[in-house]
Structure formats: structure tokens, C-alpha cells
Amino acid sequence: MAKEKFDRSKPHVNIGTIGHIDHGKTTLTAAITKVLAKHNPKNKFRSFDSIDNAPEEKARGITIAVAHVEYETAKRHYAHVDCPGHADYIKNMITGAAQMDGAIVVVAATDGPMPQTREHILLARQVGVPYIVVAMNKVDMVDDSELLDLVELEVRELLKSYQFPGDDLPVVRVSALGALNGEPQWEKTVDELMEAVDSYIPMPERAIDKPFIMPIEDIFSIQGRGTVVTGRIERGICKVGEEMEIVGFRDTRKTVVTGVEMFKKLLDEGRAGDNVGLLLRGVEKDMVERGQVIAKPGSITPHTKFKGEVYVLSKEEGGRHTPFFKGYRPQFYFRTTDVTGVAQLPEGTEMVMPGDNVSLEVELITPVAMDKGLRFAIREGGRTVGAGTVTEILK
């Protein structure tokens, strides 16, 4: 069977369900596909089991079980991620395996916010999930409307405590199971939820519209022409003749891109996602190295000290077999290269065990081009032992 062509006419948004175990994340995901399939034959219903038995995938050396579901509303096309286990959520959010433009926090009205609700909201704040919509689930199991109001208030307060606009964001009361069972009054609540997602979560800025950056992978000297750096453009556009900066490791230098080539052909410009070679004016081969970035002037700066939210691989995942302590000195792998750094643990934390997630303060021995939200891996001798996200730049 021929693959269906991806329809680009509708804007595309990435979302996911987060929240405490057994509050109905996967049931809600299945219910959304079922209700939307009734409106539009393009949408395929995905059963609970097909989502729950998510295949494992690798992201930055870490195995994560993630279910990818797609569907469309009248306005948009969505890619939706749902993870079977709590640890999978933590890994997914920290590694950015599936970036989210917004998240649906599922809270059971029967329980209210629970420890994992809190942890997922904190992680969403830390790793930069920008928008949250709340699905208050299992409302068919609560008779007392005052109790529902109380749970809603509690969720809003919790979100406010993590700097989300708790008073303003939508809280939609649903019964995922009722909708999955085809009960019209509950199907309607899923429609309401998707209308809230459509209107509240804005369109993400496309990678192509952001300031240009390309991590350098390789450097070549071309006789009589100068130095070419190659890599995959992370974001933005680079036009021939534009001034750029080389950032990281040493003092930032300015240069002009005098040529862009892809697959041995010359182009006028390179765009986000392209693997290109950039010819740089006035740059000797030994002035640039792998791990630096070529960037739009002023858009990114080099730093040595940052805070990061980190997931430490368990022994079973090929990680460390023993804990680490303050003063831990591994390599931090940013974009295309390893840099040694020293990690300090949060106050009151004696050690970090394999399988934990923790907030670390890191000082690198050489400056790296970074901004908030940048992902990194932690490696020992080329083996990945952790993954993280820069949550704050300190120096």
C-alpha cells in the first residue's frame, strides 16, 4: 500500500498527555482519536492497547517507550505523544525525544493532583513546555459539583506555583472512558477539550523563522577558496553574503559566508534541516573546530556555568552501576562535541543513583555556545550515562 501523502495545508502542532499514573492519560488519548474519527474519516481510531503497548525507541542513547498518535481537528494537524510509564515521561521530557508545543495535564477528579502530576508539571516548566491545558478526568465518578470545583482550584493553584498562568488556562471536565464507550454527553467533553487545545496552544515558531545556527561537524580547506565548515542547520536561514559569528571554545569571531553548498551543488541559501557546507571568508582551518557553532551575530553566546535538569541512566539501560557524588567530572556532549565539566549536587543531596533525575549545577572547562532549553548528554569515555536540558545559564 502506498504511503499517504502528508497534508501540509493544516498547521502542525506537537502535544502530549502528562499526569499521574492511572489518571487516564492513555484512555484520553484513545478517546480523542475515537471522537475525532467520527468527525473526519482521515482520523484513525487508536485503541487503548495499541497506545499502551508503545514500541521502545532510542533518543540520545536512552531507551524510551513512547506512543506517537496523530489526528486532526478542523483547524490543525496534531502529533500527540503518550508514554506508558512514569520513568518514560521523565526521560522523554528531559531528552526532548518528542518536543511538545503544549501539554494536556490529565488529573482525575476522584484523586486531585498527585505526586507525579506535580513532578510532570515541574518538568514541563524546567524543560520549557510553553502551554498547558488541563483535562479533569473521571468527572462521571464524582457526584458532588463542589468537590469538582475544589479539585479545579487545587490544580490551578498547583500550576501557578510552577509559574504557569493557573487562573487563565483552560480546565475542561471530561470522562475519557465515557467518550471511549461512545456516550454522547462525554464525547462532547472531548470535543470541548480539543477546542480548548486548538484555541489556547498557539502555533509554534517554525525552526526556519528563528535566528540561524549551525553546529560545526567537520572542517575542510579548499585550495584557493578558503575554509568550508559542514553540519546540519539547526534553525534559521543562511544566505550567501551574510555576516555570521563563530561561537564557542574561544573568543567569538565574525566572518562572512561566501558560499553555501549541498550535495556538491551551490545554493543561494541553506535552511533549517539542510546538511550543508558553508564557505567562510578570512578563516583559516585552525581557527575553527568541531563543536563550535556558526550563528547569526548576537543570537547566541558562549557560557561555562549552567543549571541542568538531568536523567541518569540506570544500570539496565547501560548507565553507571554506582552512584556519583559532588565534584563528579564527566564529559558533557553539546550538539557535536564533548566538553569536560564538574557537577555540583543540590543542597541536601549526598549522591545521585543510576535511574534518578536531578538538578545539577555544572561548570565546563571551556565555554560552549548555549541557550536555555539546549539538550545535552553526559558521557564517560564515549558511553552515554545521562541526558539533560539546560534550565538556567549562570555564567
From Swiss-Prot:
Residues 175-177 are annotated as: G5. InterPro entries: EF-Tu_GTP-bd, EF-Tu_GTPase, EFTu-like_2, EFTU_2, G_TR_CS, P-loop_NTPase, Small_GTP-bd, T_Tr_GTP-bd_dom. GO terms for molecular function: GTP binding; GTPase activity; translation elongation factor activity. Residues 82-85 are annotated as: G3. Gene3D superfamilies: P-loop containing nucleotide triphosphate hydrolases, Translation factors. Coiled coil: none annotated. Residues 19-26 are annotated as: G1. CDD domains: EF_Tu, EFTU_II, EFTU_III. Residues 61-65 are annotated as: G2. GTP hydrolase that promotes the GTP-dependent binding of aminoacyl-tRNA to the A-site of ribosomes during protein biosynthesis. This is Elongation factor Tu. It comes from Solibacter usitatus (strain Ellin6076).
